[in-house]
Amino acid sequence: AINKTINKRTNTHGAMRNCIEYVLRQDKTSELLTYVTGPYRHDEIDYDLVYRTFLEEKKMWNKDTGRMYAHNIISWHKDEQITPEQAFEFGKEFAEKWFSGFQTLVAVHKDKNHIHCHLVTNSVSYEDGRKLHNTKKDLECMKQLTNQMCRERGLTIAEKGKHFDGSEIEKGEVIAWNKDKYNLFRQQVRDSFVADCAMAVLKALENCISKEKFIEKM
C-alpha cells in the first residue's frame, strides 16, 4: 500500500467542504464503507453533517483559522488481494492509531480499477484543542505504520525501485501515467519545464509500437 498526503490548499472552509463532499460522493463509495472516528452525533454520514461537525469542534476551541484539515489517500495496486471491506477496516485502524484524538472521516472508493481509502482529518483535536502538525519525520513514521499494518495482513509493501511483483524497475524504463495523474500534473505545473518534458514524452508515446519509433518521435 502507498499512503500519500495530499498537500493542496487546506486553509479555507470551502476547501474542507469540497474535499469532504468529494470523498463522500455516492458514485465512488457507499454508506457501509464510510465512518467518522471520534465524536460524531449523527446516524447518517453526510458531507454537510461531517463538515459542520468539524467546524463545531474548531469553534469550541476557538481555532477556526489556519490549516483546516489533512487529507491522506491509502491506495493498493490493482492486483492486490484486498476487498473494499478489508480496505475500510485498514483505513479505520490507521486513522485511530495515527490520528488518535482527531476526528477523521474514512471512506473507501471502489470506482477505479484499484481500491483506495480516503482519510480527511480535522486539524483540531477533540481531546485538548491542539492543532495537527506533520513533519518530514512524521511522514516517514506514517509510512512505517502503513508498512507494518500491511505486513500484519500479508499485503504487499511498496518498495522504491520495484514493481508490484517485486521485480526491479530497469533504468530508463517508462512507467505509464493514468489519465487522472496526467491531468492533475498538467493543471498544477503547466508552465514548468518538467511539465513540458513530461507532456512531450506522453505525446510521443501515443501510437508507438517500438522503442525505435518512440526515439524517432522524440
Predicted regions and their residues:
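N-terminal nicking endonuclease/strand-transfer module with a His-rich metal-binding environment
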Residues: 1-217
